[in-house]
C-alpha cells in the first residue's frame, strides 16, 4: 500500500514537472514571438534607408551613423521632397541660408534645389554635424540643439551658468520646442542603436 502511494506521488510529481516544462516552453515561445513582432514593427517605423549614403558621409565627416538616421527620421520621415513652413528643405531639413554657409566649407556652389536630392541632403547634414560636434566638444545633445535652434542661440545658452554650469554642455534647454526636438532625436538615435547595433558605425 505504501509503495503504491509513493508510486502515485512520484507520477504526480513527474506530471507536474512535465506541465511546468511545457508552460515554460510555451511562455518562451510567446515572449520570443512578441519580441520579434515588436522588433519588426519598430524596424518598419525606423528603417535604414539611404544606408550607402549615410555610411559614406558619416565616415567622411566623423559623424555617428545612428545620429544621422535619427535626424533624418525626425526631420522628414525620409521624405526627400519635404519642405517646412520655415523653408527648410529635403530629407535633413536644411535651410537655404545654412546650405550657403556650409558650402563655404566645402567649396561647392549648388542651388538650394539641390537639397531635394538625397545624396546632397545627407552629405550636408553630415558636414553640418561634423562641424557642430567639433565646435561643441563632441557632445551630441548640444550639437542637436544647435542644429535646431542655431549655433548662435546655443552659444548664448552655454554662456548662461543656470543653463550650462560648465559652459560646455546644456543641463537644461530653456526653449520648449528645441527641448522637445532634442528629446525626439535622441529617442530615435537610441532606437536605431538598439535595432541595428551590429550594422551601425558609431565613429
How would you name each of these model-derived features?
Residues 18-36:
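Hydrophobic membrane-insertion alpha-helices, especially the h-region
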Residues 33-203:
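Catalytic glycan-binding domains that act on GlcNAc-containing polysaccharides
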Residues 1-16:
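N-terminal Lys/Arg-rich, disordered targeting/topogenic segments
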Amino acid at each position: 500500500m505504501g509503495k503504491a502511494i509513493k508510486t502515485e506521488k512520484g507520477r504526480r510529481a513527474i506530471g507536474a514537472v512535465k506541465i511546468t516544462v511545457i508552460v515554460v516552453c510555451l511562455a518562451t515561445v510567446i515572449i520570443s514571438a512578441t519580441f520579434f513582432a515588436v522588433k519588426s514593427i519598430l524596424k518598419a517605423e525606423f528603417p535604414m534607408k539611404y544606408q550607402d549614403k549615410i555610411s559614406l558621409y558619416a565616415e567622411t565627416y566623423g559623424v555617428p551613423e545612428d545620429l544621422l538616421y535619427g535626424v533624418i527620421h525626425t526631420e522628414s520621415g525620409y521624405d526627400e521632397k519635404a519642405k517646412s513652413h520655415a523653408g527648410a528643405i529635403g530629407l535633413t531639413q536644411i535651410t537655404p541660408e545654412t546650405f550657403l554657409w556650409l558650402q563655404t566649407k566645402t567649396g561647392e556652389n549648388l542651388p538650394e534645389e539641390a537639397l531635394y536630392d538625397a545624396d546632397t541632403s545627407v552629405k550636408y547634414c553630415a558636414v553640418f554635424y561634423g562641424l557642430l560636434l567639433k565646435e561643441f566638444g563632441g557632445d551630441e545633445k548640444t550639437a542637436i540643439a544647435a542644429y535646431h535652434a542655431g549655433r548662435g542661440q546655443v552659444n548664448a545658452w552655454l554662456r548662461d551658468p543656470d543653463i550650462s554650469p560648465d559652459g560646455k554642455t546644456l543641463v537644461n534647454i530653456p526653449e520648449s520646442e528645441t527641448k522637445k526636438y532634442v528629446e525626439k532625436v535622441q529617442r530615435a538615435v537610441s532606437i536605431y542603436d538598439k535595432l541595428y547595433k551590429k550594422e551601425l558605425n558609431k565613429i
